[in-house]
Amino acid sequence: MTLAFQLAVFALIATSSILLISVPVVFASPDGWSSNKNVVFSGTSLWIGLVFLVGILNSLIS
């Protein structure tokens, strides 16, 4: 269970780092938002899901 929690936290940190870099790049590019809207929404949905997963796993471990 601890390994699953650690992997979920690592995935959350990695996803946060990727979104931190990619979202401003998408907004700054001339045609970026209209062509990459689905990718940004998918990444945001993944991030929200990982936040809830980490919270659930944390309550099971503690």
UniProtKB/Swiss-Prot annotation:
InterPro entries: PSII_PsbZ (IPR002644), PSII_PsbZ_sf (IPR036512). SUPFAM superfamilies: PsbZ-like. Keywords: Chloroplast, Membrane, Photosynthesis, Photosystem II, Plastid, Reaction center, Thylakoid, Transmembrane, Transmembrane helix. It is a multi-pass membrane protein. It comes from the Eukaryota. Pfam families: Ycf9 (PF01737). It is found in: Plastid, Chloroplast thylakoid membrane. GO terms for biological process: photosynthesis; photosystem II stabilization. Its main location: plastid. The chain crosses the membrane at residues 8-28, 41-61. GO terms for cellular component: chloroplast thylakoid membrane; photosystem II reaction center. Belongs to the PsbZ family. This is Photosystem II reaction center protein Z. It comes from Lactuca sativa.
